[in-house]
Amino acid sequence: MHKIWMRLAAALAVLFALSATPAMAQATRTWVSGVGDDVNPCSRTAPCKTFAGAISKTAAGGEINCLDPAGFGTVTITKAISIYCNGPSNGGILAAGTTGVVVNAGATDTIVLSGLDVDGVNTGLNGVNFLAGGSLVIIDCQFRNFSQNGIKFTPSGNAGLHVE
């Protein structure tokens, strides 16, 4: 009888071990490239294609870097994150008929946007629409051809804005 219980316990342990799903850790630094693919892990050697693809694989407080000067699509930011596309790798966002970057993050989250070229193609609404977060830092970014605002800063609580 004791052997039956031991075998049953061992079988249950194996069953639970096999059914457990592994935790997917997010990277603190990810990359995007015009020749990337959003199914990639967004590493330097296997970059993502869009900011939206990279942001889901980047840990809160992490950063996304551009490997080349391509268009990386619009993005909604819901956590502390930095997007750096300075130098010859300026990242582009084409936001025809929509907003380029929507920020709706936590009350203490800092968001940094650096080196972005955001184009509304005359029908885009806003380059950046900041709804919530702790602070927004914009460095060396261009916002052009929007029907409403380049930067719309209407936080739901206390927040800071720094533009260089």
Report residues per predicted region.
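N-terminal secretory signal peptides that target proteins for export/translocation
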Residues: 1-5
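Bacterial N-terminal signal peptides
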Residues: 9-20
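Sec/Tat signal peptide C-region and signal peptidase I cleavage site
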Residues: 21-25
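Cleaved targeting-peptide boundary
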Residues: 26-30
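Acidic Gly/Asp/Thr-rich repetitive segments characteristic of extracellular carbohydrate-active
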Residues: 34-73
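Right-handed parallel beta-helix/beta-spiral solenoid domain characteristic of secreted/periplasmic
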Residues: 74, 80-129, 139-142
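Small-residue (G/S/T/A) turn/hinge positions that recur once per unit in extracellular repeat modules
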Residues: 107-109, 134, 157-159
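Solenoidal tandem-repeat scaffolds enriched in leucines and small polar residues
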Residues: 149-164
